């Protein structure tokens, strides 16, 4: 009988023995217990140099799906940029120099705006890249540089930005530059097409606000006193900076230093007035230069760093071998099972279909821990037997885990466990084999050792479970999963892919 494969990627669920703050261990998960006890499984590394990130760097959804789909270790923005910094090439990047030169055409009145997530989390950005850009701007003779700070509090601790702000205050003071505005990523980095949030961020950068600060650190402390954490800082502008007319205006230049694109695209769309979305901003500015750290898919920007090219990911190999495939995800992770899974390529393969399940629009997914998992499961079950390979993503462990709400994350995992129970029942006595993995850790550390919320990703390994009892699996990395699936389907893997994790000497055919 012809084998068919379901690859289910759980977003943000690592493996960890300790129970403290571990939503996975604390949740009641009879179906996961059955999967681990009755089926072949192994441990998969999903962080650091195992997935093309710096040593000990936590994994993330983009990198995870890139590695799973590529079948090889993908060196991503953070690694590429850090290498250039180490090799003293970063400041000589031609796209940065072009942005500097655009400002210097009228150095007295034009301003360079550096915007992005101020964090050492390394998921969307890294603060070291910002500091090097500031140094480079000074070395190139720029008079006016403004930094627009996006608070993180999600990929790092919820109230951790003051350490980074102190560094930024020191370097901007050294070169007589400014912290122009402060806002939470909730506003500046929305990706759910809630453009009112992006508009609020843009209006503040343009000076269209009466919410002021004069000292960045003091403003942040005041936000904390109102129980507002880094992610949700109310957008505010530096009053002194506004008085000097250094707000975002025509003929200024922007370098958006986030290297991860998904949460940078909407704000960038507003800034360059692209055609990517139907929404057009009422707040328009004519920039002399807009440079993005990496490619922001669908936007015409000056790209400082090109991503590693993945030309033959799993989806392409399946298509070339005549197999049909279906991708299923909700809005929050749809790009991950399509664009990122396909190596950063926006392509629809022959015999490929995609189904998008709408995410709940919510200020906090802790209020909706189930998210759209049930819709994903129902869609999967309705399409069994119609495709050779089905690839899907469950978003709720990651998105709810990011809230740091342990009880809600437990609920998310118990609901996810119920989904796997439904899937196991549906594929019983069929030729479908379920591969379950995760892209990175998160939900297994939802509280720190002091009981405080933990909202960031982790360096924990993840699972690989295969519902074929005839197999035995080696341990490996996320990049081993695609060749394992190809091996299982008896399709030769490309030379650039890593090895299959199936122990051939233990395997018997059905």
Swiss-Prot record:
Its EC number is 5.4.2.12. Pfam families: iPGM_N, Metalloenzyme. One of its GO terms (molecular function) is manganese ion binding. Binds 2 manganese ions per subunit. GO terms for cellular component: cytosol. Pathway: Carbohydrate degradation; glycolysis; pyruvate from D-glyceraldehyde 3-phosphate: step 3/5. Its cofactor is Mn(2+). The keyword Repeat does not apply. Mn(2+) 2 binds at residues 11, 61, 439-440. Substrate binds at residues 124, 154-155, 185, 191, 260-263, 333. It catalyses: (2R)-2-phosphoglycerate = (2R)-3-phosphoglycerate. CDD domains: iPGM. Signal peptide: none annotated. Keywords: Glycolysis, Isomerase, Manganese, Metal-binding. Mn(2+) 1 binds at residues 398, 402, 457. The keyword Manganese applies. The active site is at 61 (phosphoserine intermediate). One of its GO terms (biological process) is glycolytic process. HAMAP family: GpmI (MF_01038). Belongs to the BPG-independent phosphoglycerate mutase family. Catalyzes the interconversion of 2-phosphoglycerate and 3-phosphoglycerate. Monomer. This is 2,3-bisphosphoglycerate-independent phosphoglycerate mutase. It comes from Mycoplasma mobile (strain ATCC 43663 / 163K / NCTC 11711). The lineage of its organism: Bacteria, Bacillati, Mycoplasmatota, Mycoplasmoidales, Metamycoplasmataceae. The gene is gpmI.
